[in-house]
Amino acid sequence: MKARVPFIVAMLCGLAWAGNLESCASRCHEKFNRDAVCQCDRRCPQHDDCCDDYEHLCTAEEGPPEPEAFLDPEDKIPTSHLYSAPSSCQGRCREAYDKHHPCHCNDRCPEFGNCCEDFDSLCGGDHEGFSHSSDAVTKEELESISETIYRVDTNKAQKEDIVLNSQNRISPSETGNQVDRSPEPLFTYVNEKLFSKPTYAAFINLLNNYQRATGHGEHFSAQQLEEQGVFLREVMKTAVMKELYSFLHHQNRYSSEQEFVDDLKNMWFGLYSRGNDEGDSSGFEHVFSGEVKKGKVTGFHNWIRFYLQEKEGLLDYYSHNYDGPWDSYPDVLAMQFNWDGYYKEVGSVFIGSSPEFEFALYSLCFITRPGKKCHLSLGGYPLAIQTYTWDKTTYGNGKKYIATAYVVSSSQ
């Protein structure tokens, strides 16, 4: 009889455990459990497999949810492109120490005697516009300035300005299926009076200046170059960009507003080659207007561009795999769509933001966290922006162009 006691206890424990797998008691936000009858992870509402008590037990005292991952595989730049010459300081001045590099270009390399041979010629002296190690921007400072930018964006859309019809939401595993699950357009209504505001009008004037196919060189007329200048002048009049400049100036990144504007023009509008032709792409074209490379849509992270192309019948909205937690604009949507015959697997965009808001956040992250995930806070909710540098060619004294910038998950 005694020999059977452990067996009976084990069976009872097993039954108790099986019972737990039908409830979220002590399981809130655990990882996906394939042995469970129902789930309690953060994605279970999306996959419709939550336990019956998930909402009661796991969401009642929950803080602002973090965005789920919505990767954009078409935007990823191979690591080999981040540094074209690790034995040189070309495009690497003031970068963080990396033990994998044979020589270094940070402020302390002279102290340790491990600078690259061209450090003095490329990085020596007082190079304005570069941050020194003592001027490093903290995560808390990024969260604070992003909240400030969010607060002062008076040109953003109001709730009544945009009516969205987001329709079908899919799981991340389905984004590559290329199935149109939404019979209606994404935008039911947009108040186009927004587009008469100076920054919107200047932004829209830039969108028809590009050929979307890579491999075809971009050639700008005098008028088109002036349109770039008008856009920069208009955004710099806004509180959003004034706050950004003030922040970067106090961080010793720029000594004057003109230096800042000149750098913005180079990093965003400077041409480089993604294809076989010289000067067929730029950061602005890729991020805001969108490109087609090897039969797929790349970039295209702007709601105004999306709306205008959808209105013309050139864009077909398929589905979305992420909808942000914000109950006002700007919001974030990660979606799938067909752009006049070419598919975008995951395109994350701010919805209802002003042009200067996006331009400011992407610039902030590129300047302070180039090639990295940049953690921000908007209205109390976390989100992150991923940027990548393009330095097969550089400008100025080895500075890098923007390859891409887009919203990603805030979780690591």
From Swiss-Prot:
Main location: secreted
Domain EndoU: 138-411
Presence of keyword Iron: no
Protein family according to the UniProt entry: Belongs to the ENDOU family.
Protein name, UniProt field: Uridylate-specific endoribonuclease
Disulfide bonds: 24-28, 24-40, 28-58, 38-40, 38-51, 44-50, 51-58, 89-93, 89-105, 93-123, 103-105, 103-116, 109-115, 116-123
Taxonomy of the source species: Eukaryota, Metazoa, Chordata, Craniata, Vertebrata
UniProt superkingdom: Eukaryota
Entry annotation: catalytic residues: 286, 301, 344
UniProt keyword RNA-binding, yes or no: yes
Keywords: Disulfide bond, Endonuclease, Hydrolase, Lyase, Manganese, Metal-binding, Nuclease, Repeat, RNA-binding, Secreted, Signal
Pfam assignment, any one: XendoU
Protein localization: Secreted
Subunit composition and interactions: Monomer.
Catalytically driven reaction(s): ribonucleotidyl-uridine-RNA = a 5'-end dephospho-uridine-RNA + a 3'-end 2',3'-cyclophospho-ribonucleotide-RNA
MF annotations from Gene Ontology: lyase activity; metal ion binding; polysaccharide binding; RNA binding; RNA endonuclease activity; scavenger receptor activity; serine-type peptidase activity
Signal peptide residues on this chain, from the entry's feature table: 1-18
Needed co-factor(s): Mn(2+)
